[in-house]
Design a protein with these regions (language model features):
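Glycine-rich beta-strand-centered segment in the early N-terminal region that forms part
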Residues: 21-38, 52-99
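A short acidic, Gly/Pro-enriched loop at the edge of an enzyme's catalytic core
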Residues: 205-213
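NAD(P)H dinucleotide-binding glycine-rich loop of Rossmann-like/cofactor-binding domains
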Residues: 61, 70-71, 78, 85, ...
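Mid-domain Rossmann-like dinucleotide-binding core that forms the NAD(H)/NADP(H) cofactor-binding site
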Residues: 127-198
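C-terminal hydrophobic helical "lid"/dimerization subdomain
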Residues: 270-324
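Short glycine/proline-centered loop/turn elements that form peptide/ligand docking sites
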Residues: 80-82, 176-187, 220-223, 242-245
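Glycine-rich phosphate-binding loop and adjacent beta-alpha segment
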Residues: 220-283, 318-324
Length: 324
């Protein structure tokens, strides 16, 4: 089968398309024919081994897992003898951070992994693009216990995580202020934001409004810069480690004291998570944004584009010849 592999760490150019052996499902696995996957920031980080600490999990000198890809959607091609929840022909989607392997024509997935039957109202492209951004957004929203009527600011509202967060927060009844660049103001308003700040013309950290939660979905600000935006017991959330890395450290220290604090939740990857996302897709409370589509043969170009930092929502890799 065809797959995108990397046998060394580095820039997008370390990735190449080659033929590899077809995986075989064990008794407790399903074999999925991939129709769509994505290139996301997790793939970029593991490919480049940045931060360096990732090497302790992926291989100190060279990657142990050569095929990346965390999000997928496709059809079940075969099932192991012990599999009861899925059958051949099922349309499935899921998330496999840690296992990887979705940047290929076929993938084996344990029956109890983060995989579910696709909602009938989404395409393969949409299903593949629905998991990483929304599950990071959900993990943070749940950790902060955000509820109806609260004021929340989302920085990076056009990214995969930020665009999901805006939609999910509105479905909860929160009042959402979103931060994005000029050209995307109408888009973010359509996502449901009550108010939009154009970071090209205004510094959002100088905003006069205060918030119950500031969610830095872009990971480009800091608790220090955003602290003045928080109400007395407000919460700062970030999807990035921050320098040194400060955000996990602050998440350990700040809850020990009264007042404003930092939370840095570690998302759970299980069937409950993907089932929750399925429900959100079915209810139309969430729809992933898709920026560009590339065929597998052009995955290096997809990596380059993602690393410009200019993508909107998600970048999808199509394995069925469709890039429209």
């Amino acid at each position: 089968m065809k797959a995108a592999i990397h046998t060394s760490y580095g820039p997008p150019e370390v990735v190449r398309i080659t033929e590899v052996g077809m995986p075989v499902a064990t008794d407790d696995q399903l074999l999925v024919k991939i129709h769509a996957t994505t290139v996301n920031r997790t793939d970029c980080g593991y490919r480049a081994a940045k931060p360096f600490i990732l090497r302790f999990f992926t291989g100190l000198i060279r990657p142990k897992r050569t095929v990346l890809g965390t999000e997928f959607a496709g059809e079940v091609e075969a099932v192991g003898s012990n599999v009861t929840s899925f059958k051949v022909g099922d349309r499935v989607f899921g998330y496999i951070e840690g296992r990887f392997g979705a940047h290929a024509e076929y993938l084996t997935v344990p029956e109890d992994a983060s995989v579910a039957i696709m909602p009938a109202n989404v395409t393969f492209d949409e299903a593949a693009a629905s998991t990483e951004g929304s599950h990071y957004a959900l993990a943070n929203i749940q950790a902060a216990k955000i509820r109806s009527g609260q004021d929340v600011l989302v920085n990076g509202a056009t990214g995969a995580i930020g665009s999901a967060a805006v939609q999910l927060l509105k479905s909860l009844g929160a009042h959402v202020t979103a931060v994005c660049s000029t050209e995307y103001l109408p888009l973010v308003e359509r996502l449901g934001a009550d108010r939009v700040i154009d970071y090209r013309t205004a510094d959002f950290t100088a905003d006069e409004q205060t918030y119950d939660v500031v969610f830095d979905a872009a990971g480009k600000s800091s608790f220090g810069r955003c602290k003045r935006l928080l109400k007395p017991n407000g919460i700062y959330l970030s999807t990035d480690l921050g320098p040194f890395p400060q955000n996990p450290i602050l998440a350990l220290i700040t809850p020990l004291f009264r007042g404003k604090k930092v939370l840095f939740p570690i998302p759970r990857h299980d069937q409950q998570m993907v089932a929750r996302i399925k429900g959100l897709l079915e209810s139309k409370a969430f729809k992933p944004l898709i920026d560009r589509r590339y065929p597998l043969d052009e995955i290096v170009d997809a990596y380059r584009y993602v690393e410009t930092g200019q993508k909107i929502g998600n970048v999808v890799i199509c394995l069925t010849g469709r890039t429209e």
